[in-house]
Amino acid sequence: MDLGLTGRTAIVCASSRGLGRACAEALAAEGVAVVINGRDADRLAATAEAIRAASGATVTAVAADLCSEDGRARLLAACPAPDILINNNGGPPPGRFEDWDHAAWLAGLEANLLAPVMMIRAVIGGMRERRFGRIVNITSAMVKAPHSLMGLSTAARSALTAVCKGLSREVAADNVTINNLLPERIDTDRQRFMAEARAAMGGITVEAAYAEIAQSIAAGRLGRPEELAAACAYLCSAQASFVSGQNLSIDGGSYPGVF
């Protein structure tokens, strides 16, 4: 299927590795000029070169911390009028409610609510004027199925979901869509961190922890980053112009609810 994306431009946040990188790769394969971002300049440069080699696409790398105004400004200077914005950022680590102080809450909200909101605010006006825009937020399965250990992440990402739901209704008539991808148990560095924590708590090997995690997934395995990226590319496509304000779970069928 031709997704109708050739010649479009995209900003993909936090894309030097993991889910962000997979989304950048998927968009580049569709002929999108991508601007990738991360805080590790060396890793980012290597990722940019790999995507160029694989796709032939134009890839611009901007090392910046998107939790700062200066970082966001530098990223937007490299692509001031994107057709596509993929919001992505690492979540805060799991923990206990009683251990999260005021600073921890502010840091979680800055990374997973305010940074993506400020990115959307910067680009959505131009998208509406040009009558094309695709915004995809990579949030978390915890938005629909909260867990006490993931409270910091859940609170911030749920707030982002609520903000974007209202905004999506306002901009839909201008051919601007806003959707959210809700991953769970995707085989990334963050999942390895979770497996290592599980192993340490349970006194088992990391391999055994991975096996336990796989058993908890309806599909019986961890997801692959490229599986989420394929869904992301579709939501950015011309064909997805009537899909907006939605939360798409990428979780191997594990979510037990109806809605």
At which residue positions do the language-model features occur?
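Conserved glycine-rich cofactor-binding loop
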Residues: 9, 14-17
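Substrate-binding pocket helix/loop in short-chain dehydrogenase/reductase
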Residues: 96-98, 104-109, 135, 213-214
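A short, exposed helix-loop element centered on a Lys and neighboring polar residues
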Residues: 120-121, 165
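Alpha-helical segment proximal to the catalytic Tyr-Lys
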Residues: 125, 169-170, 241
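Catalytic loop of short-chain dehydrogenase/reductase
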Residues: 136-159, 164-173, 185-186
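Short C-terminal tail/terminal secondary-structure segment
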Residues: 145, 233, 244-259
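Short, small/polar-rich loop/turn modules that mediate ligand/substrate recognition or access, typified
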Residues: 172, 177, 243-245
